[in-house]
Protein backbone atom coordinates (compact mmCIF):
# COMPACT_ATOMS: atom_id res chain seq x y z
CA UNK A 1 0.00 0.00 0.00
CA UNK A 2 1.28 3.36 -1.03
CA UNK A 3 1.12 6.11 1.69
CA UNK A 4 1.25 9.84 1.02
CA UNK A 5 3.92 11.44 3.08
CA UNK A 6 4.12 15.17 3.63
CA UNK A 7 7.22 16.47 2.03
CA UNK A 8 9.66 18.19 4.31
CA UNK A 9 9.92 21.89 3.48
CA UNK A 10 11.99 24.79 4.70
CA UNK A 11 10.49 28.22 5.49
CA UNK A 12 11.94 30.82 3.24
CA UNK A 13 12.26 34.40 4.54
CA UNK A 14 10.61 36.89 2.26
CA UNK A 15 12.92 39.69 3.34
CA UNK A 16 16.11 40.40 5.26
CA UNK A 17 16.23 39.93 9.03
CA UNK A 18 16.42 43.09 11.18
CA UNK A 19 17.37 43.68 14.81
CA UNK A 20 14.58 46.22 15.52
CA UNK A 21 12.07 45.24 18.26
CA UNK A 22 8.49 44.59 17.37
CA UNK A 23 6.01 47.18 18.63
CA UNK A 24 3.45 45.91 21.13
CA UNK A 25 0.37 47.80 22.28
CA UNK A 26 0.66 49.64 25.60
CA UNK A 27 -0.11 47.50 28.63
CA UNK A 28 -3.29 48.30 30.55
CA UNK A 29 -3.92 47.33 34.15
CA UNK A 30 -7.56 46.69 34.95
CA UNK A 31 -9.26 46.81 38.34
CA UNK A 32 -12.63 45.35 39.27
CA UNK A 33 -14.90 47.71 41.19
CA UNK A 34 -16.00 45.95 44.41
CA UNK A 35 -19.37 47.72 44.26
CA UNK A 36 -20.66 47.35 40.68
CA UNK A 37 -18.15 44.62 39.59
CA UNK A 38 -17.26 46.59 36.50
CA UNK A 39 -13.71 46.23 35.17
CA UNK A 40 -12.04 49.65 35.00
CA UNK A 41 -8.86 50.76 33.29
CA UNK A 42 -6.48 51.79 36.09
CA UNK A 43 -5.43 54.93 34.21
CA UNK A 44 -9.05 55.99 33.78
CA UNK A 45 -9.73 55.33 37.46
CA UNK A 46 -6.73 57.48 38.39
CA UNK A 47 -7.89 60.31 36.13
CA UNK A 48 -11.29 60.13 37.86
CA UNK A 49 -9.67 60.66 41.30
CA UNK A 50 -10.00 56.96 42.17
CA UNK A 51 -13.78 57.05 41.82
CA UNK A 52 -15.58 54.39 39.77
CA UNK A 53 -16.94 56.16 36.66
CA UNK A 54 -19.93 53.83 36.57
CA UNK A 55 -21.29 53.57 40.13
CA UNK A 56 -19.40 56.34 41.94
CA UNK A 57 -17.65 54.02 44.39
CA UNK A 58 -14.92 56.02 46.15
CA UNK A 59 -11.74 53.93 46.38
CA UNK A 60 -9.40 54.54 49.30
CA UNK A 61 -6.39 56.74 48.57
CA UNK A 62 -3.23 57.55 50.48
CA UNK A 63 -2.82 60.71 52.49
CA UNK A 64 -0.34 62.19 50.01
CA UNK A 65 -2.56 61.35 47.05
CA UNK A 66 -5.42 63.14 48.76
CA UNK A 67 -3.16 66.09 49.47
CA UNK A 68 -2.34 66.36 45.76
CA UNK A 69 -6.06 66.21 44.90
CA UNK A 70 -6.93 69.00 47.33
CA UNK A 71 -4.12 71.52 47.76
CA UNK A 72 -3.18 74.14 45.16
CA UNK A 73 -0.17 72.84 43.25
CA UNK A 74 3.19 73.82 44.70
CA UNK A 75 1.80 75.38 47.89
CA UNK A 76 2.07 72.53 50.40
CA UNK A 77 4.72 72.83 53.11
CA UNK A 78 4.98 69.72 55.28
CA UNK A 79 5.30 69.97 59.05
CA UNK A 80 6.95 67.50 61.46
CA UNK A 81 7.81 64.93 58.80
CA UNK A 82 10.65 63.60 60.98
CA UNK A 83 8.41 62.14 63.72
CA UNK A 84 8.27 58.34 63.80
CA UNK A 85 6.63 55.81 66.11
CA UNK A 86 8.60 53.62 68.50
CA UNK A 87 7.79 50.43 70.37
CA UNK A 88 7.94 51.93 73.88
CA UNK A 89 5.78 49.14 75.39
CA UNK A 90 7.85 46.34 73.78
CA UNK A 91 4.60 45.07 72.34
CA UNK A 92 5.00 41.71 70.53
CA UNK A 93 5.89 42.17 66.81
CA UNK A 94 5.07 45.92 66.86
CA UNK A 95 8.59 47.02 65.95
CA UNK A 96 8.67 44.63 62.98
CA UNK A 97 5.22 45.81 61.92
CA UNK A 98 6.29 49.46 61.99
CA UNK A 99 9.35 48.70 59.88
CA UNK A 100 7.50 46.69 57.24
CA UNK A 101 4.60 49.13 56.93
CA UNK A 102 6.96 52.09 56.70
CA UNK A 103 8.96 50.42 53.92
CA UNK A 104 5.82 49.50 52.02
CA UNK A 105 4.03 52.86 52.34
CA UNK A 106 7.02 55.17 52.28
CA UNK A 107 5.63 57.01 55.33
CA UNK A 108 6.87 57.26 58.91
CA UNK A 109 3.33 57.14 60.31
CA UNK A 110 -0.36 57.47 59.51
CA UNK A 111 -0.76 61.22 58.97
CA UNK A 112 0.71 63.95 56.78
CA UNK A 113 0.49 67.48 58.21
CA UNK A 114 1.40 70.92 56.94
CA UNK A 115 0.09 74.14 55.48
CA UNK A 116 -0.93 75.13 51.98
CA UNK A 117 -3.57 76.85 49.90
CA UNK A 118 -6.97 75.58 48.79
CA UNK A 119 -8.49 77.72 46.03
CA UNK A 120 -6.06 80.45 47.06
CA UNK A 121 -6.97 80.39 50.77
CA UNK A 122 -4.22 79.70 53.31
CA UNK A 123 -4.93 76.83 55.69
CA UNK A 124 -3.31 74.27 57.94
CA UNK A 125 -4.00 70.69 56.89
CA UNK A 126 -3.74 67.08 57.95
CA UNK A 127 -4.34 63.98 55.85
CA UNK A 128 -4.66 60.62 57.56
CA UNK A 129 -3.45 57.55 55.66
CA UNK A 130 -5.16 54.15 55.76
CA UNK A 131 -2.11 52.56 54.12
CA UNK A 132 -0.18 52.90 57.38
CA UNK A 133 -1.66 50.44 59.89
CA UNK A 134 -5.19 51.35 58.77
CA UNK A 135 -4.73 54.94 59.93
CA UNK A 136 -4.67 53.86 63.57
CA UNK A 137 -4.01 56.63 66.07
CA UNK A 138 -0.87 56.35 68.13
CA UNK A 139 1.48 58.85 69.74
CA UNK A 140 2.85 60.21 66.47
CA UNK A 141 -0.58 60.75 64.93
CA UNK A 142 -1.70 62.48 68.12
CA UNK A 143 1.42 64.62 68.35
CA UNK A 144 1.43 65.71 64.71
CA UNK A 145 -2.26 66.64 64.64
CA UNK A 146 -1.95 68.39 68.00
CA UNK A 147 1.01 70.42 66.70
CA UNK A 148 -0.96 71.25 63.56
CA UNK A 149 -3.70 72.89 65.63
CA UNK A 150 -1.12 74.70 67.76
CA UNK A 151 0.69 76.04 64.68
CA UNK A 152 -2.65 77.07 63.16
CA UNK A 153 -3.60 78.93 66.35
CA UNK A 154 -0.27 80.79 66.37
CA UNK A 155 -0.50 81.66 62.67
CA UNK A 156 -4.22 82.49 62.70
CA UNK A 157 -5.00 79.78 60.15
CA UNK A 158 -8.06 77.57 59.74
CA UNK A 159 -7.57 73.80 59.85
CA UNK A 160 -8.85 71.35 57.24
CA UNK A 161 -8.51 67.70 58.23
CA UNK A 162 -9.17 64.50 56.26
CA UNK A 163 -9.88 61.56 58.55
CA UNK A 164 -9.53 57.84 57.91
CA UNK A 165 -8.83 55.42 60.72
CA UNK A 166 -9.54 52.03 62.18
CA UNK A 167 -9.34 53.58 65.66
CA UNK A 168 -6.80 53.49 68.46
CA UNK A 169 -3.42 51.82 67.95
CA UNK A 170 -3.66 48.98 70.44
CA UNK A 171 0.10 48.34 70.35
CA UNK A 172 0.55 51.62 72.25
CA UNK A 173 -1.96 50.83 74.99
CA UNK A 174 -3.68 53.58 76.97
CA UNK A 175 -1.21 56.10 75.56
CA UNK A 176 -3.10 55.78 72.29
CA UNK A 177 -6.38 56.44 74.09
CA UNK A 178 -4.97 59.63 75.61
CA UNK A 179 -4.35 61.09 72.15
CA UNK A 180 -8.12 61.64 71.89
CA UNK A 181 -8.06 64.02 74.87
CA UNK A 182 -4.79 65.62 73.78
CA UNK A 183 -6.03 66.56 70.31
CA UNK A 184 -9.46 67.62 71.59
CA UNK A 185 -7.81 70.11 73.95
CA UNK A 186 -5.83 71.58 71.05
CA UNK A 187 -9.00 71.78 68.93
CA UNK A 188 -10.73 73.70 71.73
CA UNK A 189 -7.90 76.23 72.05
CA UNK A 190 -7.90 76.77 68.32
CA UNK A 191 -11.68 77.30 68.40
CA UNK A 192 -11.49 79.71 71.34
CA UNK A 193 -9.00 81.75 69.33
CA UNK A 194 -11.64 82.07 66.60
CA UNK A 195 -10.20 79.43 64.28
CA UNK A 196 -12.27 77.56 61.72
CA UNK A 197 -12.02 73.76 61.64
CA UNK A 198 -13.40 71.78 58.69
CA UNK A 199 -13.44 68.00 58.87
CA UNK A 200 -13.76 65.73 55.84
CA UNK A 201 -14.77 62.18 56.79
CA UNK A 202 -13.52 59.44 54.48
CA UNK A 203 -13.95 55.67 54.49
CA UNK A 204 -13.51 54.36 57.16
CA UNK A 205 -13.43 56.73 60.13
CA UNK A 206 -14.04 54.75 63.31
CA UNK A 207 -13.25 54.31 66.99
CA UNK A 208 -11.27 56.92 68.89
CA UNK A 209 -10.85 59.20 65.88
CA UNK A 210 -14.62 59.41 65.43
CA UNK A 211 -15.05 59.96 69.18
CA UNK A 212 -12.66 62.91 69.15
CA UNK A 213 -11.37 65.25 66.47
CA UNK A 214 -13.32 63.80 63.52
CA UNK A 215 -16.60 65.03 65.02
CA UNK A 216 -15.31 68.31 66.48
CA UNK A 217 -15.29 70.38 63.30
CA UNK A 218 -17.26 73.60 62.91
CA UNK A 219 -18.26 72.16 59.55
CA UNK A 220 -18.22 68.43 58.88
CA UNK A 221 -18.21 67.14 55.31
CA UNK A 222 -18.12 63.51 54.22
CA UNK A 223 -17.36 61.56 51.07
CA UNK A 224 -20.25 59.42 49.79
CA UNK A 225 -20.83 56.06 51.51
CA UNK A 226 -17.97 56.58 53.98
CA UNK A 227 -18.25 54.40 57.08
CA UNK A 228 -18.18 56.67 60.13
CA UNK A 229 -18.78 55.09 63.52
CA UNK A 230 -17.55 54.76 67.07
CA UNK A 231 -18.21 51.02 67.23
CA UNK A 232 -17.77 49.29 63.88
CA UNK A 233 -20.66 47.37 62.32
CA UNK A 234 -19.07 43.97 63.01
CA UNK A 235 -18.76 44.80 66.72
CA UNK A 236 -22.39 45.90 66.89
CA UNK A 237 -23.62 42.81 65.05
CA UNK A 238 -21.70 40.54 67.40
CA UNK A 239 -23.04 42.40 70.41
CA UNK A 240 -26.67 42.65 69.24
CA UNK A 241 -26.81 39.29 67.40
CA UNK A 242 -28.61 40.81 64.43
CA UNK A 243 -27.80 42.08 60.96
CA UNK A 244 -27.56 45.84 60.54
CA UNK A 245 -29.68 47.65 57.93
CA UNK A 246 -28.09 48.66 54.64
CA UNK A 247 -26.48 52.09 54.81
CA UNK A 248 -26.17 52.03 58.61
CA UNK A 249 -23.30 54.28 59.83
CA UNK A 250 -22.57 55.53 56.31
CA UNK A 251 -22.24 59.20 55.30
CA UNK A 252 -25.84 59.48 54.20
CA UNK A 253 -26.94 57.99 57.54
CA UNK A 254 -24.92 60.66 59.35
CA UNK A 255 -26.49 63.40 57.24
CA UNK A 256 -30.01 62.15 57.97
CA UNK A 257 -29.27 61.96 61.69
CA UNK A 258 -27.77 65.43 61.93
CA UNK A 259 -24.08 64.62 62.34
CA UNK A 260 -22.61 66.11 59.18
CA UNK A 261 -23.26 69.21 57.12
CA UNK A 262 -23.04 67.74 53.64
CA UNK A 263 -22.04 64.67 51.64
CA UNK A 264 -19.67 65.86 48.92
CA UNK A 265 -18.28 63.78 46.01
CA UNK A 266 -14.49 63.68 45.88
CA UNK A 267 -14.30 65.74 42.72
CA UNK A 268 -16.12 68.64 44.42
CA UNK A 269 -14.36 68.62 47.78
CA UNK A 270 -11.53 71.04 46.97
CA UNK A 271 -13.91 73.64 45.49
CA UNK A 272 -16.41 73.24 48.33
CA UNK A 273 -13.74 73.57 51.02
CA UNK A 274 -12.24 76.54 49.18
CA UNK A 275 -15.68 78.16 49.06
CA UNK A 276 -16.16 77.70 52.81
CA UNK A 277 -12.68 79.00 53.60
CA UNK A 278 -13.34 82.15 51.58
CA UNK A 279 -16.68 82.79 53.29
CA UNK A 280 -15.12 82.41 56.72
CA UNK A 281 -12.36 84.84 55.77
CA UNK A 282 -15.12 87.40 55.21
CA UNK A 283 -15.09 87.51 51.43
CA UNK A 284 -17.10 85.67 48.82
CA UNK A 285 -15.87 82.85 46.56
CA UNK A 286 -14.77 83.59 43.03
CA UNK A 287 -16.90 83.13 39.93
CA UNK A 288 -17.86 79.54 39.25
CA UNK A 289 -18.05 78.55 42.93
CA UNK A 290 -20.10 75.35 43.42
CA UNK A 291 -22.92 77.14 45.25
CA UNK A 292 -22.98 80.35 43.27
CA UNK A 293 -26.51 81.29 42.15
CA UNK A 294 -26.50 82.34 38.50
CA UNK A 295 -29.21 84.88 37.69
CA UNK A 296 -28.59 85.06 33.93
CA UNK A 297 -31.57 86.33 31.99
CA UNK A 298 -33.72 87.17 34.99
CA UNK A 299 -33.35 90.92 35.04
CA UNK A 300 -36.47 92.68 33.87
CA UNK A 301 -38.46 89.46 33.59
CA UNK A 302 -41.37 88.40 35.77
CA UNK A 303 -40.35 84.81 36.30
CA UNK A 304 -41.94 84.71 39.74
CA UNK A 305 -45.68 84.32 40.16
CA UNK A 306 -47.87 87.26 41.15
CA UNK A 307 -50.04 86.57 44.13
CA UNK A 308 -53.30 85.09 42.87
CA UNK A 309 -55.83 87.46 44.39
CA UNK A 310 -58.64 89.40 42.84
CA UNK A 311 -58.32 92.26 45.32
CA UNK A 312 -56.23 93.31 48.29
CA UNK A 313 -57.33 91.56 51.50
CA UNK A 314 -59.82 93.62 53.46
CA UNK A 315 -59.75 91.84 56.81
CA UNK A 316 -57.13 90.44 59.16
CA UNK A 317 -58.45 86.92 58.63
CA UNK A 318 -58.08 87.31 54.86
CA UNK A 319 -54.43 88.26 55.40
CA UNK A 320 -53.91 85.14 57.53
CA UNK A 321 -55.48 82.93 54.89
CA UNK A 322 -53.35 84.58 52.22
CA UNK A 323 -50.18 83.73 54.15
CA UNK A 324 -51.09 80.05 53.78
CA UNK A 325 -51.49 80.20 50.01
CA UNK A 326 -49.37 77.85 47.90
CA UNK A 327 -48.74 80.77 45.53
CA UNK A 328 -46.67 82.75 48.02
CA UNK A 329 -42.92 83.10 47.69
CA UNK A 330 -41.23 80.57 49.96
CA UNK A 331 -38.04 81.07 51.93
CA UNK A 332 -36.19 78.88 49.44
CA UNK A 333 -37.29 81.12 46.58
CA UNK A 334 -36.21 84.23 48.45
CA UNK A 335 -32.78 82.69 48.97
CA UNK A 336 -32.39 81.58 45.34
CA UNK A 337 -33.79 84.83 43.90
CA UNK A 338 -32.34 87.28 46.40
CA UNK A 339 -28.79 86.04 47.08
CA UNK A 340 -25.72 85.58 44.87
CA UNK A 341 -24.84 82.24 46.48
CA UNK A 342 -25.84 79.93 49.30
CA UNK A 343 -24.17 76.91 50.94
CA UNK A 344 -26.73 74.90 52.89
CA UNK A 345 -25.47 73.25 56.08
CA UNK A 346 -27.28 70.44 57.84
CA UNK A 347 -27.82 68.85 61.22
CA UNK A 348 -28.23 69.68 64.89
CA UNK A 349 -25.36 67.32 65.95
CA UNK A 350 -27.74 65.52 68.33
CA UNK A 351 -30.59 63.77 66.56
CA UNK A 352 -31.38 64.77 63.00
CA UNK A 353 -31.70 67.31 60.25
CA UNK A 354 -35.05 69.09 60.04
CA UNK A 355 -36.08 69.87 56.46
CA UNK A 356 -38.46 72.56 57.74
CA UNK A 357 -35.46 74.72 58.65
CA UNK A 358 -33.07 75.66 55.84
CA UNK A 359 -29.81 77.09 57.16
CA UNK A 360 -26.39 77.94 55.83
CA UNK A 361 -24.05 80.67 54.63
CA UNK A 362 -25.12 82.97 51.82
CA UNK A 363 -23.62 85.99 50.16
CA UNK A 364 -24.81 89.08 48.35
CA UNK A 365 -22.84 91.94 46.81
CA UNK A 366 -19.62 90.58 48.27
CA UNK A 367 -20.94 90.18 51.83
CA UNK A 368 -21.35 86.84 53.63
CA UNK A 369 -24.37 86.29 55.89
CA UNK A 370 -25.72 83.37 57.92
CA UNK A 371 -29.23 82.59 56.69
CA UNK A 372 -31.79 80.63 58.72
CA UNK A 373 -35.20 80.16 57.14
CA UNK A 374 -38.37 78.20 57.76
CA UNK A 375 -39.39 76.54 54.51
CA UNK A 376 -42.94 75.34 53.82
CA UNK A 377 -42.26 73.95 50.34
CA UNK A 378 -44.16 74.46 47.10
CA UNK A 379 -45.46 71.12 45.85
CA UNK A 380 -47.55 68.79 48.00
CA UNK A 381 -44.70 66.28 48.13
CA UNK A 382 -42.20 68.89 49.22
CA UNK A 383 -44.59 70.37 51.77
CA UNK A 384 -44.98 66.96 53.36
CA UNK A 385 -41.19 66.47 53.44
CA UNK A 386 -40.79 69.86 55.11
CA UNK A 387 -43.69 69.21 57.49
CA UNK A 388 -45.51 72.27 56.11
CA UNK A 389 -42.97 74.56 57.75
CA UNK A 390 -43.60 73.30 61.29
CA UNK A 391 -40.16 72.80 62.79
CA UNK A 392 -39.07 70.00 65.13
CA UNK A 393 -36.63 70.53 68.02
CA UNK A 394 -33.72 69.53 65.78
CA UNK A 395 -34.60 72.38 63.42
CA UNK A 396 -34.31 74.95 66.19
CA UNK A 397 -31.11 73.33 67.47
CA UNK A 398 -29.61 73.44 63.98
CA UNK A 399 -30.48 77.14 63.88
CA UNK A 400 -28.81 77.71 67.25
CA UNK A 401 -25.66 75.88 66.12
CA UNK A 402 -25.32 78.15 63.10
CA UNK A 403 -26.10 81.27 65.14
CA UNK A 404 -23.19 80.44 67.43
CA UNK A 405 -20.94 80.00 64.42
CA UNK A 406 -22.11 83.34 63.03
CA UNK A 407 -21.11 85.00 66.31
CA UNK A 408 -17.75 83.20 66.34
CA UNK A 409 -16.87 84.23 62.80
CA UNK A 410 -18.42 87.71 62.83
CA UNK A 411 -21.24 87.15 60.33
CA UNK A 412 -24.66 88.81 60.64
CA UNK A 413 -27.72 86.56 60.89
CA UNK A 414 -30.78 86.80 58.64
CA UNK A 415 -33.88 84.83 59.67
CA UNK A 416 -36.81 84.31 57.29
CA UNK A 417 -39.90 83.27 59.22
CA UNK A 418 -42.97 81.57 57.73
CA UNK A 419 -44.62 79.01 59.98
CA UNK A 420 -47.97 78.26 61.53
CA UNK A 421 -46.01 77.24 64.62
CA UNK A 422 -43.60 74.69 66.05
CA UNK A 423 -44.66 71.10 65.39
CA UNK A 424 -46.87 69.57 68.07
CA UNK A 425 -46.34 65.83 68.31
CA UNK A 426 -45.20 63.01 70.57
CA UNK A 427 -41.70 62.84 69.12
CA UNK A 428 -41.25 66.61 69.29
CA UNK A 429 -42.17 66.61 72.97
CA UNK A 430 -39.95 63.61 73.70
CA UNK A 431 -37.00 65.45 72.17
CA UNK A 432 -37.74 68.67 74.05
CA UNK A 433 -39.60 71.10 71.79
CA UNK A 434 -40.05 73.61 74.61
CA UNK A 435 -36.40 73.38 75.65
CA UNK A 436 -35.21 73.89 72.07
CA UNK A 437 -37.30 77.05 71.65
CA UNK A 438 -36.29 78.36 75.09
CA UNK A 439 -32.58 77.91 74.38
CA UNK A 440 -32.94 79.85 71.12
CA UNK A 441 -34.57 82.78 72.93
CA UNK A 442 -31.68 82.95 75.40
CA UNK A 443 -29.04 82.51 72.71
CA UNK A 444 -30.45 85.19 70.44
CA UNK A 445 -30.94 87.70 73.25
CA UNK A 446 -27.19 87.83 73.83
CA UNK A 447 -25.73 86.94 70.43
CA UNK A 448 -22.84 89.29 69.67
CA UNK A 449 -23.62 89.80 66.00
CA UNK A 450 -26.42 91.69 64.20
CA UNK A 451 -29.70 89.79 63.74
CA UNK A 452 -32.48 90.73 61.32
CA UNK A 453 -35.68 88.66 61.22
CA UNK A 454 -38.27 89.02 58.47
CA UNK A 455 -41.75 87.54 58.79
CA UNK A 456 -42.42 86.58 55.18
CA UNK A 457 -45.72 84.75 55.65
CA UNK A 458 -47.35 83.41 58.78
CA UNK A 459 -45.61 84.08 62.08
CA UNK A 460 -47.11 81.53 64.41
CA UNK A 461 -46.52 81.82 68.15
CA UNK A 462 -43.37 80.44 69.83
CA UNK A 463 -42.32 78.61 66.69
CA UNK A 464 -41.89 81.96 64.97
CA UNK A 465 -40.46 83.76 68.00
CA UNK A 466 -37.68 81.14 68.22
CA UNK A 467 -36.16 82.80 65.13
CA UNK A 468 -37.38 86.35 65.77
CA UNK A 469 -35.48 87.69 68.78
CA UNK A 470 -33.63 90.23 66.67
CA UNK A 471 -32.21 93.74 66.47
CA UNK A 472 -34.61 94.50 63.63
CA UNK A 473 -37.91 92.71 62.96
CA UNK A 474 -39.50 93.34 59.59
CA UNK A 475 -42.75 92.05 58.10
CA UNK A 476 -44.06 91.79 54.58
CA UNK A 477 -47.19 93.90 54.28
CA UNK A 478 -49.18 90.75 53.46
CA UNK A 479 -47.87 88.73 56.43
CA UNK A 480 -49.26 88.04 59.90
CA UNK A 481 -47.65 87.49 63.31
CA UNK A 482 -49.70 86.21 66.21
CA UNK A 483 -49.63 84.47 69.57
CA UNK A 484 -52.18 81.96 68.24
CA UNK A 485 -54.10 81.35 65.02
CA UNK A 486 -57.49 83.12 64.80
CA UNK A 487 -59.25 79.77 64.46
CA UNK A 488 -57.59 78.39 67.59
CA UNK A 489 -58.26 81.60 69.52
CA UNK A 490 -61.98 81.52 68.66
CA UNK A 491 -62.20 77.84 69.54
CA UNK A 492 -60.35 78.14 72.87
CA UNK A 493 -61.90 81.37 74.15
CA UNK A 494 -65.37 81.26 72.67
CA UNK A 495 -65.81 77.61 71.69
CA UNK A 496 -66.89 78.88 68.27
CA UNK A 497 -64.60 78.72 65.22
CA UNK A 498 -67.11 80.81 63.28
CA UNK A 499 -65.82 83.81 65.22
CA UNK A 500 -62.31 83.46 63.69
CA UNK A 501 -62.74 86.74 61.81
CA UNK A 502 -63.53 88.54 65.06
CA UNK A 503 -60.55 86.89 66.74
CA UNK A 504 -58.20 87.93 63.93
CA UNK A 505 -59.19 91.57 64.32
CA UNK A 506 -58.88 91.43 68.10
CA UNK A 507 -55.42 89.80 68.02
CA UNK A 508 -53.89 92.76 66.15
CA UNK A 509 -51.76 90.47 64.03
CA UNK A 510 -51.22 92.53 60.88
CA UNK A 511 -48.01 94.40 60.07
CA UNK A 512 -49.51 97.90 60.63
CA UNK A 513 -50.98 96.80 63.96
CA UNK A 514 -47.68 95.38 65.18
CA UNK A 515 -45.70 98.40 63.99
CA UNK A 516 -48.04 100.62 66.01
CA UNK A 517 -47.53 98.41 69.06
CA UNK A 518 -43.74 98.65 68.73
CA UNK A 519 -43.33 94.90 68.18
CA UNK A 520 -41.79 95.23 64.73
CA UNK A 521 -39.46 97.83 63.27
CA UNK A 522 -40.55 98.09 59.67
CA UNK A 523 -42.80 96.88 56.85
CA UNK A 524 -41.67 95.66 53.42
CA UNK A 525 -44.45 96.44 50.96
CA UNK A 526 -44.98 93.40 48.73
CA UNK A 527 -48.32 94.28 47.17
CA UNK A 528 -48.49 93.16 43.54
CA UNK A 529 -44.82 92.17 43.37
CA UNK A 530 -43.38 89.08 41.72
CA UNK A 531 -41.43 86.60 43.80
CA UNK A 532 -38.20 87.98 42.39
CA UNK A 533 -39.13 91.52 43.35
CA UNK A 534 -40.20 90.44 46.83
CA UNK A 535 -36.87 88.64 47.34
CA UNK A 536 -35.00 91.73 46.20
CA UNK A 537 -36.98 93.98 48.54
CA UNK A 538 -36.46 91.67 51.52
CA UNK A 539 -32.70 91.37 50.96
CA UNK A 540 -32.31 95.10 50.34
CA UNK A 541 -34.13 95.96 53.58
CA UNK A 542 -32.18 93.37 55.57
CA UNK A 543 -28.76 94.43 54.30
CA UNK A 544 -29.61 98.11 54.88
CA UNK A 545 -30.32 97.16 58.50
CA UNK A 546 -27.02 95.26 58.68
CA UNK A 547 -25.22 98.41 57.50
CA UNK A 548 -26.66 100.35 60.44
CA UNK A 549 -26.20 97.61 63.03
CA UNK A 550 -22.67 96.85 61.88
CA UNK A 551 -21.49 100.22 63.20
CA UNK A 552 -22.30 99.20 66.79
CA UNK A 553 -19.86 97.46 69.12
CA UNK A 554 -20.91 94.17 70.73
CA UNK A 555 -21.89 95.64 74.08
CA UNK A 556 -24.04 98.38 72.55
CA UNK A 557 -25.66 95.93 70.15
CA UNK A 558 -26.71 93.46 72.84
CA UNK A 559 -27.76 96.19 75.29
CA UNK A 560 -30.02 97.82 72.72
CA UNK A 561 -31.52 94.43 71.91
CA UNK A 562 -32.18 93.83 75.59
CA UNK A 563 -33.80 97.27 76.00
CA UNK A 564 -35.92 96.68 72.91
CA UNK A 565 -37.60 93.63 74.41
CA UNK A 566 -37.50 95.01 77.95
CA UNK A 567 -39.77 97.86 76.83
CA UNK A 568 -42.46 95.66 75.25
CA UNK A 569 -45.67 95.34 77.26
CA UNK A 570 -48.32 97.59 78.75
CA UNK A 571 -49.69 97.57 82.26
CA UNK A 572 -50.95 99.80 85.03
CA UNK A 573 -49.87 100.01 88.64
CA UNK A 574 -52.58 99.55 91.24
Where do the language-model regions lie?
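Catalytic-face loop-and-helix region of soluble metabolic enzyme cores
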Residues: 239
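Glycine-rich anion-binding loops of enzyme active sites
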Residues: 206-213, 229, 463
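Terminal-region recognition feature
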Residues: 1-198, 204, 216, 223, ...
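Active-site pocket-lining/capping segments in soluble small-molecule metabolic enzymes
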Residues: 224-226, 233
Amino acid sequence: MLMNRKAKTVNVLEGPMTESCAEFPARHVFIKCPECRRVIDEARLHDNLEVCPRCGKHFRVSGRARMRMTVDEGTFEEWDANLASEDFLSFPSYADKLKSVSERSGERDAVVCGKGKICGCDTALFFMDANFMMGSMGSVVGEKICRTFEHATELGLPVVGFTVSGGARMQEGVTSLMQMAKISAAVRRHSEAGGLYITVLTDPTTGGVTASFAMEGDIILAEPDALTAFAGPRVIEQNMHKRLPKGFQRSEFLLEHGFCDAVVPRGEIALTVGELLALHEGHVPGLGAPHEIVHTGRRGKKLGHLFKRSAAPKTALEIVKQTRSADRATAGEMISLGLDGFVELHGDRYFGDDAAVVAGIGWKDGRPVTVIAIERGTTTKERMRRNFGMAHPEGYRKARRLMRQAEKFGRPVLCLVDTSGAFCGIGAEERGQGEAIAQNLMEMSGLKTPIVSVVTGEGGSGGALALSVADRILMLSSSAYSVVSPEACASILWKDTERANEAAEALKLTAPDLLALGIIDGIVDDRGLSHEEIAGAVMSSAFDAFDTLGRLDDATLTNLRYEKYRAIGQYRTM
